[in-house]
Amino acid sequence: ALPILHKKELTHKFFQLVMSNYKVNRSVTFYANSLCITPKYLTMVVKEVSGKSAKDWITEYMILELKGLLTNSTLNIQEIVEKTQFSNQSSLGRFFRRHTGLSPLQYRKKYLTTEQRTNFSKNNTI
């Protein structure tokens, strides 16, 4: 077994990679390959050190990004799809609903303030 310090360093490197790449790469294999380890080992170490799996962390970063784009930008859903490199609106919608219980549009309507809604509707359709 590796010393805990090595596992913490590996986890830290994983987080650095995720922060730089989660918008374009959501595959555990990508991060494992970047760190020259197997996906199984990466998942085990990250879970041991942080309490969550590598996939869960990647997903969490992506959901936070999507929530931010939905509530703090005037981008429409198609523009968000392109910015986050989902294959289409359906795949983004399924991913978002699976992790939040709401569609992207439901989330946007629920969390935009009245002022934001007014400004947003001038530029876009919700």
Identify the function of each model-found stretch.
Residues 49-89, 109-126:
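Terminal helix-turn-helix DNA-binding modules in bacterial transcription factors
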Residues 1, 14-27, 46, 50, ...:
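Basic, amphipathic alpha-helical hairpins
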Residues 25, 29-61, 81-106:
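Basic/polar phosphate-binding segments, predominantly the helix-turn-helix DNA-binding elements
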